Amino acid sequence: MAFTTTASGLQFEDTTVGTGAEAQPGRNVTVHYTGWLYDNGVQGAKFDSSKDRGEPFIFPLGGGMVIRGWDEGVQGMREGGTRTLIIPPGLGYGARGAGGLIPPNATLKFEVELLGA
């Protein structure tokens, strides 16, 4: 498979296509995720993982409670599916970075598994 690039610059690839309910804006979704820094096609340091904590993450899709790349990238997934997201800085943490773990203007790579939609 190959990555699809959206008009915003988000890249995504479904590594596993789910068969359950579809993630839609306005509904809470439950995901497991792992995030890495990503630079010129090379996966860098892991900065966060719900799997490491053993605790899924729940958020309202499209509600602006997460970075824009997640609101856009999780939409349309189906329960049971796994998607890889490559998120440019403008859809991530931008020039401010985050918490000393994510430098300013960082591109991010996430593996997201949709557990509930």
Identify the role of each PLM range.
Residues 1-117:
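Cross-family detector of peptidyl-prolyl cis-trans isomerase
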